C-alpha cells in the first residue's frame, strides 16, 4: 500500500553522497574570509607606528642642538615670521635627510616593501616638517620646560595612535584624544601607503599636518615677537640670593 510505495521513494544515497550531506547538515553555514591589503610580516605591520616615532625623536634631538629661535635674526630685529622660519627650516631639512636615510635602510637592509613608495616618502617629508614645527614652538614658547612637554606629547600620541592595537581597545581618554593628535593621522595614512588601500585617510592626514604646521609656525612667530618686546621684568629681573 502507501507505506510500501513511500519506502520505495526514499533515496538510497551512496557513501560519498551521505558524507557530503552529513557535512552540510553539521555545518550549514561556512564563512569565507579574504584579507585586503594584508601586511606580509610583523615588521611591515608595525612600520607605520615606529617610523613617525623615529621622526619625532629626530626633531626632538635636533632642537637640543639647534636653538628654536635664531639668535642672529633676533639680534638684528628681523620680522617674527623670518625668525620662526630661520629656526624651523634647518630642522625641516634635517628631517628630510633623516627620512631618506631611514627609508633607505628599511627598504634595502630590512626589506620593507611599500605599495606606494613615492607617496610614502613624500608624505614622510611633510610629517618631518610638521613634527619639527610643533617641537620648535614648544621649545620657543616654554623654554627648558618645553622639552618635558615634547616628551609628554610624544607619550600621549604613542598611547592613542592605535599603532599596535586598535584604539577602540584603549581606555576612553585615549579614544577621546585620538582624532586630535597628528600621529594618529600619520599612522592611519602610512598603513594605506605601505600596504595599500583607500587614499582618503592619506589626504585627510595631509590636510591635518599642513594645519598643524601652519599653526605651530604662527605660534612660534608669536613667541619670537614676544622675545623682541622688552618689559621691565626682562630689563630688571628679580634678584635671587
Language model regions located:
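Membrane-spanning alpha-helical segments of multipass transporters and channels
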Residues: 2, 7-241
Amino acid at each position: 500500500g502507501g507505506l510500501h510505495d513511500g519506502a520505495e521513494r526514499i533515496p538510497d544515497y551512496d557513501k560519498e553522497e551521505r558524507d557530503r550531506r552529513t557535512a552540510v547538515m553539521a555545518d550549514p553555514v561556512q564563512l569565507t574570509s579574504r584579507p585586503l591589503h594584508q601586511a606580509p610580516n610583523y615588521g611591515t605591520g608595525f612600520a607605520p607606528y615606529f617610523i613617525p616615532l623615529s621622526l619625532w625623536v629626530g626633531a626632538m634631538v635636533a632642537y637640543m642642538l639647534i636653538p628654536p629661535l635664531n639668535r642672529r635674526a633676533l639680534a638684528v630685529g628681523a620680522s617674527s615670521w623670518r625668525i620662526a622660519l630661520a629656526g624651523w627650516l634647518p630642522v625641516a631639512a634635517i628631517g628630510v635627510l633623516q627620512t631618506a636615510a631611514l627609508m633607505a635602510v628599511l627598504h634595502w637592509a630590512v626589506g620593507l616593501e611599500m605599495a606606494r613608495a613615492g607617496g610614502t616618502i613624500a608624505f614622510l617629508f611633510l610629517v618631518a616638517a610638521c613634527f619639527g614645527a610643533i617641537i620648535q614652538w614648544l621649545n620657543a614658547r616654554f623654554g627648558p620646560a618645553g622639552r618635558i612637554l615634547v616628551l609628554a606629547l610624544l607619550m600621549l600620541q604613542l598611547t592613542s595612535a592605535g599603532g599596535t592595537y586598535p584604539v577602540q581597545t584603549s581606555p576612553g581618554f585615549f579614544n577621546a584624544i585620538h582624532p586630535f593628535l597628528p600621529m594618529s593621522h600619520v599612522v592611519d595614512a602610512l598603513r594605506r601607503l605601505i600596504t595599500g588601500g583607500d587614499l582618503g585617510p592619506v589626504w585627510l592626514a595631509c590636510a591635518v599636518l599642513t594645519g598643524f604646521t601652519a599653526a605651530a609656525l604662527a605660534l612660534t612667530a608669536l613667541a619670537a615677537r614676544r622675545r623682541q618686546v622688552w618689559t621691565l621684568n626682562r630689563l630688571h629681573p628679580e634678584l635671587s640670593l
